[in-house]
């Protein structure tokens, strides 16, 4: 039987050098680590890792080749009260595995035990890691490096974006390949998108609870192998990495960046009753935040929380991020529940992972976007991330909806959000682009549902409609649900236009939810994380071409307005912005706080956004000059010069002089 050589303690994971494979695994509390390899017949062969450098276990298997399937058995104490849950009866996934063979099905054998260990061996059904070789011709690929001030983000799900697209070949719909298909790329280009932000593509598992209900985790925020691509999005699991890189290369050639939504805050092992896949059995005490009683701190709402202040876990997370940039050429990351990244356990801007990213010559050069909260005390950290990060701006989301749909936001508060929420983000040298403005996202109502539903309708999720937020700031305009009279449809359309205009012509970085530009509805489900079906897949055959054209025209208009593209804070008298009332006069303090919802925003001294958010048609006197409405609010031919705009109720228009 072949013996393992000692090998090297770096890099993490399994790496083929042309002669064999070097294996490394971190565990500070293990007493022994077995590498388990499986031949073509499924026969298991075990080898003790002979090298032990600090907390890194390592060994080298001569003559091993790509395609080899493997896992680990890690020996150590079973001491739940101290946070130790070693169980060598369970085959474990390498946290740095690049490919996984097998499915993460609900099975009692994939649990380690709660108070007492479950000593039933699970190698026969446990997923296996696969050694991969990294050969890929990137040709002349180069990152677009779109300036932040010019960035337009489009948030999309790999499968949902293309699964029903009639112009994409059936055999590649819903896959990585479809992202790089000319039809998809041309659509994004015509829309004006500069960055495609993908919901998680790292391999994830469906929670046992969902599997028992016949559902699955659709969004992907339940990671199990952070270096491996989710195989269900590939035409062939064996070529997933190649297909993904082909798509990125094609998108880059079109000048479109790719941003990955990444989940570093928790794992698919969930709470102590959850499955055992990897980290819990490798070194539970190091990888997770552990309470004094040995249970997990659940600061994520998912059962566990990764300890991103532990040096080894920081190294793991940093290596993962570098892998996606260096191996797949991604252009940035959106970090789910990113407050966890700064926990020590209190949130700190100089937390170890933040410092590691800032000091990394690779990671410090890509786009970094935080979802700036978690669910623990002190978890709401909007505006408090280090300067390298942009942040989801929920202040903007709520303000835009309240202003246009609830009519209860003063002009001053609306203007503050329109101006990149400078009261929140103008600190530590940050620029307006740090505010990622959004009206909708994958989590919550779609834009169409915001104007069609007053209440969430999540019954299909199997939780009796208890899940999902009740704070939607939506307005069904008088009838719950889709459809209705022509008048109702038109009023809803006007509200959609107002929200899109506010999003795409505000200072800051706009993020558009895929499907909002053509009227996609989830029928009132505002938490469709487990709906892998026509509720979430974009139905291109029903797309509103008029709304798509409206959205594209707004993005095109945004790119013509210097005040929105220069990415610098607006200052009094700098010519970037003037705030005027319905009579084209500066607003008084009382008008800002208590005045009617009528406002004129003059940008770059040439572009005027006139707003009438009242219930009545109102005359708006435009500033001096020859003004004409511009697309998408008027045709390009035969512009009509006007001095007074008859502002419809809840309406707005953009003029140029």
From Swiss-Prot:
Give the start-end ranges of region Disordered: 460-479
Q: Where is this site: Transition state stabilizer?
A: 443
- Record-listed E.C. numbers: 3.2.1.196
Pfam (any one): Alpha-amylase
Which GO molecular function, any one, fits this protein according to its record?
A: hydrolase activity, hydrolyzing O-glycosyl compounds
Active-site residues, as the UniProt record annotates them: 336 (nucleophile), 371 (proton donor)
Which UniProt key words apply to this protein? Answer: Carbohydrate metabolism, Glycogen metabolism, Glycosidase, Hydrolase
Q: Which GO terms describe its biological process?
A: glycogen catabolic process
Question: What CDD domains does UniProt report for this protein, alphabetically?
Answer: AmyAc_Glg_debranch, E_set_GDE_Isoamylase_N
Catalytically driven reaction(s) = Hydrolysis of (1->6)-alpha-D-glucosidic linkages to branches with degrees of polymerization of three or four glucose residues in limit dextrin
Record-linked InterPro entries:
GlgX_C, GlgX_Isoamylase_N_E_set, Glyco_hydro_13_cat_dom, Glyco_hydro_13_N, Glyco_hydro_b, Glycogen_debranch_bac, Glycogen_debranch_GlgX, Glycoside_hydrolase_SF
Determine the domain of life of the protein's source.
Bacteria
What pathway annotation does it carry?
A: Glycan degradation; glycogen degradation
Q: Does the keyword Hydrolase apply?
A: yes
Q: Which family does it belong to?
A: Belongs to the glycosyl hydrolase 13 family.
Function noted in UniProt: Removes maltotriose and maltotetraose chains that are attached by 1,6-alpha-linkage to the limit dextrin main chain, generating a debranched limit dextrin.
Q: What is this protein called?
A: Glycogen debranching enzyme
Q: Which species does this protein come from?
A: Escherichia coli O7:K1 (strain IAI39 / ExPEC)
């Amino acid at each position: 039987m072949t013996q393992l050589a000692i090998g090297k303690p770096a890099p993490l994971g399994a790496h083929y050098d042309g002669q064999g494979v070097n294996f490394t695994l971190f565990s500070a509390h293990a007493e022994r680590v077995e590498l388990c390899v499986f031949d073509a017949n499924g026969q298991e062969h075990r080898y003790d890792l002979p090298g032990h450098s600090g907390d890194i276990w390592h060994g080298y298997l001569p003559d091993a080749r790509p395609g080899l399937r493997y896992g680990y058995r890690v020996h150590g104490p079973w001491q739940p009260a101290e946070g130790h849950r070693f169980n060598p009866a369970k085959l474990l996934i390498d946290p740095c595995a690049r490919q996984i063979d097998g499915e993460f099905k609900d099975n009692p054998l994939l649990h380690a035990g709660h108070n007492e260990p479950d000593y039933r061996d699970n190698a026969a059904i446990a997923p296996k890691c696969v050694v991969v070789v990294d050969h890929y011709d990137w040709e002349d690929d180069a990152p677009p490096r779109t300036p932040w001030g010019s960035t337009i983000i489009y948030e999309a799900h790999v499968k949902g974006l293309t699964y029903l697209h009639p112009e994409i070949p059936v055999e590649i719909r819903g896959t990585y390949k479809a992202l790089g298909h000319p039809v998809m790329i041309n659509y994004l280009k015509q829309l004006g998108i500069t960055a495609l932000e993908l919901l998680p593509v790292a391999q994830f598992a469906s929670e046992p609870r969902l599997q028992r209900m016949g559902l699955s985790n659709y969004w992907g925020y339940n990671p199990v192998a952070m270096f491996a691509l989710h195989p269900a999005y590939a035409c062939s699991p064996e070529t997933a990495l190649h297909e993904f890189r082909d798509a990125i290369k094609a998108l880059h050639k079109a000048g479109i960046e790719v941003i990955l939504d990444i989940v570093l805050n928790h794992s698919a092992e969930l709470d102590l009753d959850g499955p055992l896949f990897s980290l819990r059995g490798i070194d539970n005490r190091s990888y997770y935040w552990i309470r004094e009683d040995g249970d997990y701190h659940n600061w994520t709402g998912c059962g566990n929380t990764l300890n991103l202040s532990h040096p080894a876990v920081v190294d793991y997370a940093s290596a993962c991020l570098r892998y996606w940039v260096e191996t797949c050429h991604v252009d940035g990351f959106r970090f789910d529940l990113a407050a966890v990244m700064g926990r020590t356990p209190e949130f700190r801007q100089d937390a170890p992972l933040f410092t590691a990213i800032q000091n990394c010559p690779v990671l410090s050069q890509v786009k970094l976007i935080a979802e700036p909260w978690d669910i623990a005390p002190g978890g709401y950290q909007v505006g408090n991330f280090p300067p390298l990060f942009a942040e989801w701006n929920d202040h903007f989301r709520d303000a835009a909806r309240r202003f246009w749909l609830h009519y209860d936001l003063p002009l001053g508060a609306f203007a503050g959000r329109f101006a990149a929420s400078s009261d929140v983000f103008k600190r530590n040298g940050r620029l307006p682009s740090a505010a990622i403005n959004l009206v909708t996202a994958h989590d919550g109502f779609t834009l169409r549902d915001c104007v069609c539903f007053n209440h969430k309708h999540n019954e299909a999720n199997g939780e009796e409609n208890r899940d999902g937020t009740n704070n939607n700031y939506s307005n069904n305009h008088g009838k719950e649900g889709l459809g209705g009279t022509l008048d109702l449809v038109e009023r809803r359309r006007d509200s959609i236009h107002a929200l899109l205009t506010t999003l795409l012509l505000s200072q800051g970085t706009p993020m558009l939810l895929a499907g909002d530009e053509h009227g996609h509805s989830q029928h009132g489900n505002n938490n469709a994380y487990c709906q892998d079906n026509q509720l979430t897949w974009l139905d291109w055959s029903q797309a509103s071409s008029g709304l798509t054209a409206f959205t594209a025209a707004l993005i095109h208009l945004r790119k013509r307005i210097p005040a929105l593209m220069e990415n610098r804070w607006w200052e009094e008298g700098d010519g970037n912005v003037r705030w005027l009332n319905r009579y084209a006069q500066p607003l008084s303090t009382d008008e800002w706080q208590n005045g009617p919802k009528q406002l004129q925003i003059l940008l770059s001294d040439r572009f005027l956004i006139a707003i009438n958010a009242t219930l009545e048609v109102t005359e708006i006197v435009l500033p001096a000059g020859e003004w004409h409405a511009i697309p998408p609010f008027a045709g390009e031919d035969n512009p009509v010069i006007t001095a007074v705009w008859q502002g419809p109720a809840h309406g707005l228009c953009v003029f140029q002089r």
